[in-house]
Amino acid sequence: EPAETVSLSEPEHMEGSAAASVEERDRTKTDALHKNDTANNSSEVTSENTYEMRLYTKAPNQNSTIKIQYPAFYGSKAEEINSLILAKVQDMASLDPSLFPENPRIDVNYQSAVTLQNSKIISVVFWGNTDIEVSQFPTTDLYALNIDLTSLELITLKDLYTVNAEFEKVFFEKAFFPSDPITSYSEEKFSEMLKLQTSEYTLPSPFTNADSMRCFLKPEGIVLSMPAIHASGSDHFEAELLYSDIQDYYLPEQIYWNE
C-alpha cells in the first residue's frame, strides 16, 4: 500500500551540486517518475544526486498521528535507496500488536537530515519522540541509516570498526559534543552525560552490544548514539569521534567519507 507523504521543500543539494531545473524538481513529485529517472541513469552513483524532504503521515489507526520527515532521492539507484529509507520510516511508525491494546493512540513526530552523501555512501539520521497512550511518558529516540551505494546494503558500526576494549577506551578519551544536526543534551552537560556512559555508572557497557549501537557519518567523523536514563532529560545520548582518532580500528578497504 503506498505511503501517504507530502513534499516539504525543494530538493536539497550537496555541496557543489548544480541547481536542479524546474522540470527535474517536478519529476521528484511522483514515485513513478523516480523510477523512470533511475532507469535512464547509469549504475554509477555520484554526489550530484539530489533529494527533497517529504513527510510520512500514514497512521496505524484513526486515533493516531504520524509525522516523520525523510529524504526522497532522485538520480541513479534512487528507487533502491528510497525503498531502504521508506522501510525504516514505516518501521518507525508501526507498533507491535502483541505489546499494546487494539488501536492505541500513538503520536510520532520525527525530523531527519542527510549527514553525509557521496559516491560511496548516504548517511541519514532521524530524531524525535513517540507518545503512546498506554505509556507513562513520551520517549525520545534516534534512528540512523547508512547505505552503501555499491552493494545497497545497510552499514552498521561493526561493519565499519573493530569495537573492542581499546576502541571503547579511545571513545571515552576522544569523544566530543557533536553539534549539528542533533544533540540530545546541551554542550555544557556533555561531559557529565559522557561520564554517565562509563562502566562506573552504566552496566553493562553500551559497547557490549555494539551490534545494536546506532551511528551516522558526517564529513569529519562518526556520531555514536546510545541509550540514556530518561530522568536525565533524554532517552538517548550522542557523541562524535574524528575518523583520524579511530583509524586503527577501521575495517573496510574503501574510505567511505572520502570521494
Predicted regions and their residues:
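Compositionally biased intrinsically disordered regions enriched in Thr/Gly
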Residues: E1-E259
